[in-house]
Structures are given as structure tokens and as C-alpha cells.
């Protein structure tokens, strides 16, 4: 914006279009530190907007104090549907990612929080966690800002946190749907974070009429 000159990188296409090969250690052989290192090396950050490094969030001072891993599937902002589509199309991948995170916190339970205007997504995810004693789906009232971190923690656990507290202070860790899926990709496939499901809106006169 200031018009300053900065260094730039020019990437030239070699025209070969080779598919990148990712490598990951077998998950069952990974230690906690190796899982966190895989998340860090893949560059996984919160995909809900803040961009906070996920490996830092998943390494609190006292892991045993974490009681809830909350997956934010509320997506309360108007028109946004990226996480909704993930829950609809690949709910099993979301659950797989959540189980990886839960393995880091043996005493914690997982809660996948979804607003009640997404009944079909709730049904899809609920079907995937059927019989899993550690994971539940919380159907939340549709309202703004239901997906805000503090609001979500209160809605799912009844725990209120003030502005000076972090979610970990209330025994909670919150990540959104896309972030949890990215964790799975990083840990089990060695895939770095270079893509994200997004919502595309088409504004035309015809669309406005409809």
C-alpha cells in the first residue's frame, strides 16, 4: 500500500506438471513430539482466519489439563460454506483428524460443534462418530457470533472465559474443521498446507433476481 520496493520471487513453470510426492512416517510409529513436528513442518495454521500456528496450540503447558477438543463447524458468517462442504463430502477425514488430535490428549473428549441450520452435515458427521465414546456432535442454535471461540466454548461446555484467559485455561482447545483436516493430511500423508476449501459467490443480475 505504501508503494515501497520489495524483493520478489518469480516461479517459472517447467511444463512437466509432475505430481508432488509426500512422505510421512507410519502414524502408529510416531511419538507425540513427532506428530507435533509433522504439523509444524507442514506449516499448519488455524484456517478460521487467525492463522495461529497449530503445533503451538496443540502443545499447552499441561496437556493433561485439556478436557475438550472442540471442532468449530458452526460457520456462522453469512454465505460461508467451506467447512460445511468438508463435513458433507468427507466427514470421515474430519473424524480421522480429530482422532489424531485426541491421541495427543488422552484425557480429552472431542466435540464437533455444528449450527442447527446444517442438519444434513450434522447427520453425516454423527454417522461417522457412531459408537465412538470420545467424540460427540453438538447441535447449536444458529446465531451470530456462535462460531466465536469464547461463545463456542460456552455453548458446548458451559464454561465462560474472560478476555484475559485462553481456551486452554478452561481446559479446551478449539480448531475449525479445515484445520483438523489439514492436521490429518500433514501427519498421515506428509502434505504441507497449500490448499483450502473456499466459498465462491457469483453475483449476477440473474442471481440477484433469484
Residue ranges and their predicted role:
Residues 206-210:
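A short, hydrophobic C-terminal helix/tail in secreted or cell-surface proteins
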Residues 5-7, 34-35, 40-42, 64-67, ...:
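Short coil/turn connectors at secondary-structure junctions
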Residues 17, 28, 34, 85-129:
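Internal alpha/beta scaffold segment
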Residues 62, 66-70, 88-102, 183-191:
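Structured alpha-helical segments in the cores of large, soluble enzyme domains
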Residues 108-205:
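Hydrophobic alpha-helical positions that pack around
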Residues 2-47, 52, 63, 119-120:
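Acidic low-complexity segments
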Residues 21-24, 50-51, 56-58, 80-84, ...:
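Short acidic, glycine/serine/threonine-rich loops at helix termini
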Residues 71-83:
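Gly-rich Lys/Arg/Thr-decorated short loops/hinges at beta-loop-alpha junctions or inter-strand turns
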Amino acid at each position: 500500500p505504501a508503494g515501497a520496493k520489495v524483493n520478489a520471487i518469480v516461479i517459472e513453470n517447467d511444463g512437466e506438471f509432475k505430481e508432488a510426492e509426500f512422505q510421512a512416517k507410519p502414524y502408529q510409529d510416531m511419538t507425540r513430539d513427532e506428530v507435533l513436528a509433522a504439523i509444524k513442518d507442514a506449516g499448519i495454521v488455524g484456517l478460521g482466519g487467525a492463522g495461529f500456528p497449530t503445533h503451538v496450540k496443540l502443545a499447552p503447558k499441561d496437556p493433561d489439563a485439556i478436557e475438550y477438543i472442540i471442532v468449530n463447524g458452526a460457520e456462522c458468517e453469512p454465505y460461508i460454506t467451506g467447512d460445511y462442504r468438508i463435513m458433507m463430502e468427507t466427514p470421515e477425514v474430519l473424524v480421522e483428524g480429530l482422532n489424531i488430535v485426541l491421541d495427543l490428549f488422552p484425557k480429552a473428549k472431542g466435540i464437533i460443534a455444528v449450527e442447527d441450520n446444517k442438519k444434513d452435515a450434522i447427520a453425516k458427521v454423527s454417522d461417522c462418530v457412531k459408537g465412538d465414546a470420545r467424540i460427540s456432535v453438538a447441535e447449536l442454535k444458529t446465531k451470530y457470533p456462535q462460531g466465536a471461540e469464547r461463545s463456542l466454548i460456552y455453548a458446548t461446555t458451559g464454561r465462560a472465559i474472560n478476555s484475559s484467559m485462553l481456551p486452554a485455561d478452561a481446559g479446551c482447545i478449539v480448531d475449525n474443521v479445515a484445520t483438523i483436516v489439514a492436521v490429518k493430511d500433514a501427519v498421515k500423508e506428509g502434505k504441507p498446507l497449500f490448499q483450502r476449501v473456499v466459498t465462491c459467490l457469483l453475483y449476477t443480475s440473474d442471481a440477484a433476481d433469484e
